Regions:
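N-terminal secretory targeting signals
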Residues: 1-68, 196
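Bacterial extracytoplasmic/cell-wall-associated proteins, especially those involved in peptidoglycan
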Residues: 55-196
Length: 196
C-alpha cells in the first residue's frame, strides 16, 4: 500500500511539474496500471489524472488502445465488490456481475452510463449509502474483472441484463451457487428482439 501511495504521489508531482515544456504525459509510463492501482486504493484524483494522461498518450501516438474512463473503472469495480467481492466467489462470477452492468449500459431498456445503471432506483441495494459512496474500496480481483470487461472481454450474451437470487426476465442464462450466499441467477431480457 505504501508503494502504491508513493507511486501515486509521484504521478501527481509529475502532472504538476512536467519536466518538458508542453509535455502532459510521459510516453514511458503505463497510465492504465496507475488507474488500476488508484481504483484499488480509492485514489480518485490520481485515477482521473492518469486517465487524462493515458487518453492524451493514445491520441498523440495514434494508438488503438481502448480509452477507459476512470469513473467507469472505479464504479464498476465497486459494484462488483459489493455484489461479489468475497474471496470465496470465482472470477467468473465477478465478471458476470460487471457484465450485467455493461450490458445494461448498451441496452435500450436501461440508462446509458455505468453510473446511471448502478444508481438506478431499485436496482442495486445499498449504492446510495455512505458505505458504498465514500468508504468502499474495490478489491483487486474486482478491479481486475472491471478492467477486463472495459477492455472488451465478455462471458455472456448482450441480452443478459438481470442478476438476482431468483430467476427473472426472459430466462436464466447462467447461475452460480455458493453455500453461504445461495444461488445467483444471470437472466436475459424479456425483450430479446432488442438485442439482435
Amino acid at each position: 500500500m505504501k508503494k502504491t501511495a508513493l507511486l501515486l504521489a509521484a504521478l501527481l508531482l509529475f502532472l504538476t511539474f512536467p519536466g518538458r515544456a508542453g509535455a502532459d504525459y510521459d510516453p514511458e509510463v503505463d497510465y492504465l496500471s496507475i488507474m488500476v492501482r488508484a481504483a484499488a486504493c480509492g485514489d480518485i484524483e490520481a485515477g482521473r489524472a492518469a486517465e487524462i494522461c493515458r487518453n492524451e498518450k493514445i491520441d498523440r501516438t495514434g494508438s488503438d488502445e481502448v480509452k477507459i474512463a476512470f469513473e467507469d473503472l472505479f464504479l464498476l469495480a465497486k459494484i462488483i465488490t459489493s455484489e461479489a467481492g468475497s474471496e470465496r466467489l470465482s472470477d467468473e462470477w465477478r465478471m458476470c456481475v460487471g457484465e450485467v452492468v455493461l450490458n445494461r449500459v448498451a441496452s435500450p431498456e436501461f440508462p446509458d452510463t455505468v453510473k446511471e445503471v448502478i444508481m438506478q432506483e431499485g436496482q442495486y441495494e445499498g449504492v446510495n449509502t455512505d458505505e458504498f459512496l465514500y468508504y468502499l474500496n474495490p478489491t483487486e480481483a474486482s478491479v481486475d474483472a472491471a478492467l477486463r470487461l472495459l477492455l472488451g472481454e465478455r462471458l455472456m450474451e448482450p441480452q443478459v441484463v438481470f442478476q438476482a437470487n431468483f430467476p427473472q426476465g426472459g430466462g436464466v442464462y447462467a447461475r452460480y451457487y455458493d453455500s453461504l450466499y445461495g444461488y445467483t441467477y444471470f437472466c436475459s431480457s424479456s425483450n430479446p428482439e432488442l438485442y439482435w
